[in-house]
């Protein structure tokens, strides 16, 4: 699911480095992408959920009606019913639309990184140990954190953050840092990892935040002190 709705669309080819995730790469568009939904019939349930985190992300970015549809139809998606086709097709169209207007991520394409500033930091600190935390789980926790951080900063209602968290939990995805197995890192360590994010510009943090579900935006120059305060609050929950 993850590859069908995310990495197969957009032409990014990247690898991790000791300094962070996806920091070395290029853009190379394929001639054709085929998504065989039949191959998902044998996908491990945990991996299916991980891919679903990216599906839900598209609704949170700029498509509240799709997010609402997922809230009502996620059981059919997980049962590999007709809803799965709709979910994957909608996700691909959503990403393709954003990529078409900003292929090399000079602007709006960064919206696709919703949840990833947090999520990549969690993955880096756990040394990309996928049995402990896979990418989709990191994105799920990161997306929930991004909505709570948006509410913390006064950009969106806490009800929106709670709604996203509730949906992630309803499909079995983690939504809190404490859900990561054997987590023993401090807020300061998380913040340090965030400064390795590819969206950092001139030493300043960039986050994808939201004014509501379906209303995400790029927030540049976010105060490290505000992030640290929020992370300490999160770790205390």
Locations of regions flagged by a protein language model:
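Short beta-strand segments
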Residues: 27, 34-35, 113, 208-210
């Amino acid at each position: 699911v993850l590859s069908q709705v995310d990495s197969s669309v957009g032409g990014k080819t990247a690898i991790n480095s000791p300094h962070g995730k996806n920091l070395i790469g290029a853009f190379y568009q394929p001639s054709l992408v085929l998504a065989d939904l039949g191959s998902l019939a044998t996908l491990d349930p945990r991996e299916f959920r991980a891919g679903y985190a990216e599906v839900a992300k598209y609704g949170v970015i700029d498509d509240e009606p799709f997010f609402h549809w997922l809230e009502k139809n996620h059981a059919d998606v997980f049962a590999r019913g007709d809803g799965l086709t709709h979910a994957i097709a909608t996700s691909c169209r959503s990403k393709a639309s954003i990529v078409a207007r900003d292929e090399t991520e000079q602007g709006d394409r960064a919206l696709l990184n919703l949840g990833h500033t947090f999520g990549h930091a969690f993955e880096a600190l756990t040394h990309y140990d996928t049995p402990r935390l896979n990418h989709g789980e990191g994105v799920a926790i990161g997306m929930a954190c991004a909505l709570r951080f948006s509410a913390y900063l006064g950009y969106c209602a806490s009800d929106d953050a709670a709604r996203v968290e509730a949906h992630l939990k309803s499909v079995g995805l983690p939504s809190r840092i404490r859900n990561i197995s054997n987590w023993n890192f401090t807020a300061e360590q998380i913040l340090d990892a965030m400064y390795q994010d590819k969206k950092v510009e001139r030493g300043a943090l960039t986050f994808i935040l939201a004014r509501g579900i379906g209303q995400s935006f790029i927030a540049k120059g976010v105060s490290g002190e505000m992030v640290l305060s929020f992370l300490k609050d999160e770790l205390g929950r």
